[in-house]
A protein has these predicted regions:
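Acidic (Asp/Glu)-rich catalytic clusters
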Residues: 24-28, 49-62, 101-104
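Hydrophobic, well-structured mid-protein blocks that either form specific transmembrane helices
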Residues: 102-150
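Active-site beta-loop-alpha junctions enriched in small/polar residues
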Residues: 10-14, 36-40, 66-70, 113-117, ...
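Glycine-rich tight-turn/loop motif centered on a GG-T
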Residues: 19, 23, 33-40, 71-86, ...
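Hydrophobic faces of well-ordered beta-strands that scaffold small-molecule active sites
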Residues: 5-9, 33-35, 61-65, 108-112, ...
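Active-site rim beta-loop-alpha module in soluble metabolic enzymes
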Residues: 148-209
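Active-site-adjacent beta->alpha loops and helix N-cap segments on the catalytic face
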Residues: 16-22, 41-55, 121-128, 147-158
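Glycine/small-residue-rich loop that forms an oxyanion/phosphate-binding "nest" at active or ligand-binding sites
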Residues: 69-109
Length: 215
């Protein structure tokens, strides 16, 4: 059985007078990009420019919606209701879809950002609302979600195309979630170790957790 591995990166995080990241260089090495939608990062001009660059370099475009938390880069927990989560999705995906339409680019996928991503992995009513919002904007858009999570299983149940995501540079807990950034073992900094972990995840469907257990 053959596998297609998509190399993916978050992009479009600059805004106003602030330049973050090296987007044009990164685009030479990835096959898809998650474009910030203006709340945790990005702005309308950056969103448009990023879509154009992705088209020029043949990189698939995905939406990267987050919490309305520019100061915290969307990584802080927020008390969000299902209605709010659904509206957040429609608002941000709708904006990026508009730029994709302008340049005749397919909006291939959606990947949540930061605390929004983490919440949807473990909170069923938020995950349901996220998928409701996705389907309201474009039912053909794939859901890029944490492999084995609730939202991954619910998306598959609904018939939404799913991209099972694994991380090369992040640690995993025994529950299959990401180790919080504030805790030891959250990041894999050695390139060789990251490569070996990716190969295990892709070839064997397993990962070594922060406790040393293989799941």
């Amino acid at each position: 059985m053959s596998h297609y591995i998509d190399l993916n990166s978050d992009l479009g995080e600059s805004f106003g007078n602030y330049t973050l990241g090296m987007d044009s260089e990164v685009l030479n090495h990835v096959t898809s990009a998650n474009v910030a939608c203006g709340w945790h990062a990005g702005d309308p001009l950056i969103m448009e420019a990023t879509v154009k660059m992705c088209k020029e370099k043949g990189v698939a475009v995905g939406a990267h919606p987050g919490y309305p938390d520019l100061m915290g880069f969307g990584r802080r927990k927020m008390a969000v209701s299902p209605d709010e989560a659904r509206a957040y999705m429609i608002y941000q995906l709708g904006a990026l879809q508009g730029f994709c339409n302008q340049y005749d680019v397919e909006l291939q996928h959606m990947k949540l950002h930061g605390a929004f991503y983490n919440m949807a992995c473990v909170t069923p009513d938020i995950a349901d609302a996220v998928l409701d919002g996705l389907q309201a904007v474009n039912s053909k858009v794939r859901a890029m979600v944490l492999s084995g999570s609730y939202i991954a299983k619910e998306a598959e149940r609904r018939g939404i195309p799913v991209i099972q995501e694994v991380f090369a540079d992040r640690g995993y807990t025994e529950e299959g979630t990401l180790v919080p950034r504030t805790e030891e073992g959250a990041f894999i900094k050695d390139p060789q170790e990251a490569l070996e972990r990716v190969l295990m995840m892709v070839q064997e469907g397993k990962v070594v957790t922060n406790t040393g257990k293989t799941i």
